[in-house]
Amino acid sequence: MNEVYVFTSESVSEGHPDKIADQISDAILDAILAQDPKARVACEVLVKTGMVLVGGEITTKAWVDVEEITRHVIKDIGYNSSQMGFDWESCAVLSAIGKQSPDIAQGVDNQQTKILGAGDQGLMFGYASRETDVFMPAPIAYAHRLMEKLAKARKSGQLPWLRPDAKCQLTLKYEQGMPVEVDTVVFSTQHSPDIEHKDLVEAIREEIIKSVLPAEWLNDKTRYFINPTGRFVIGGPLGDCGLTGRKIIVDTYGGMARHGGGCFSGKDPSKVDRSAAYAARHVAKNIVAAGLADKCELQISYAIGVAEPTSIFVDTFGTGRLKNSEIIDLIHTHFDLTPQGIIDQHDLLRPIYRQTATYGHYGRESFPWERLDKVAELSKAL
């Protein structure tokens, strides 16, 4: 690809209302899996001024204190004062949790064959490319790093006027399919009322943006829009309602790859919306790392109650060193994409999900689906 183009992705902070909901959902999931790895969990959360509503379907032998977990997450994020419009100590926590439908359960847990079927029908995508060291698209990878840096500056006291809610949007210029320049940075962060706008703009540009983005990508043409409305004091759940699963593009590839539509947070690994999307990322990343292609997008689909995928599709965008059909044959040979196979290979019945709920589910080496454990086998096909 020789054309010049720009591409934009966004990330949001851990204090963004939708991300508060995601973190509570996954914290509850982790607490349950720690006691009962075979639990069935679909936990949804709504947050608004002074209130958290936890709902969903949960079938488990475990007992967890939903209210305590919820308050701990809110405290950890940093909503610790009613002056922010949300306070971990005083907010109401309401619960509306039921059990998994027996009609769904009988399809997922086949008692005759002992085979774990997919928890629902659906289609999932995985993607990888060579444009960053973590095989992720650069716009979303660096947008996440900006949000992580902001959180560290807030929690360490480096920038004491910061508050938890924030988001950024990064537009990169591409040449020959690789990022070469930052075109635009949009950065909005909640703040205390006593910081002057010009001081905030300078601090964010110098101490956050320029400390994260490669210096060679920044120049006098780079555009910065930092708190462009001039004031962002009212934020978090006071400013906007938050819901689990509303940041699925932030959670994945920033729009660079397609998305099957299912969210991740609050779902146990029997839900292929989550586990098969992780598996698809694992497959795509190993294909690219093995040199079979410079870019790879993989689609998998499932039928409820059926273990084997109903389809596998691969697109290497003209960068493949093998035919797409040959890569699909390698996937069938080297990867078990049944729900049980995915769970076993990545050891997913563990309390590992709270950490995925912020700064993306991909691109961090601590996650088991990021392992490059199939590269040696796949590279033999070249």
Swiss-Prot record:
Cofactor(s) named in the record: Mg(2+); K(+)
Keyword list, A-Z: ATP-binding, Cytoplasm, Magnesium, Metal-binding, Nucleotide-binding, One-carbon metabolism, Potassium, Transferase
Gene Ontology biological process terms from the UniProt entry: one-carbon metabolic process; S-adenosylmethionine biosynthetic process
Binding residue positions for ATP: H16, D165, A166, K167, R231, F232, D240, R246, K247, K267
Reactions performed catalytically: L-methionine + ATP + H2O = S-adenosyl-L-methionine + phosphate + diphosphate
Main location: cytoplasm
Binding annotation for L-methionine: E57, Q100, D240, K271
GO MF annotation: an example: magnesium ion binding
Pfam families membership: S-AdoMet_synt_C, S-AdoMet_synt_M, S-AdoMet_synt_N
Binding site for Mg(2+): D18
Record-listed E.C. numbers: 2.5.1.6
InterPro entries assigned: ADOMET_SYNTHASE_CS, S-AdoMet_synt_C, S-AdoMet_synt_central, S-AdoMet_synt_N, S-AdoMet_synthetase, S-AdoMet_synthetase_sfam
Cofactor-binding details, from the entry: Binds 2 divalent ions per subunit.
Binding site for K(+): E44
Keyword Lipoprotein: no
Root EC class: transferase
Recorded superkingdom: Bacteria
UniProt subcellular location: Cytoplasm
Region Flexible loop, annotated ranges: 100-110
Subunit structure: Homotetramer; dimer of dimers.
Functional summary from the UniProt entry: Catalyzes the formation of S-adenosylmethionine (AdoMet) from methionine and ATP. The overall synthetic reaction is composed of two sequential steps, AdoMet formation and the subsequent tripolyphosphate hydrolysis which occurs prior to release of AdoMet from the enzyme.
Similarity annotation: Belongs to the AdoMet synthase family.
Protein's UniProt name: S-adenosylmethionine synthase
Gene: metK
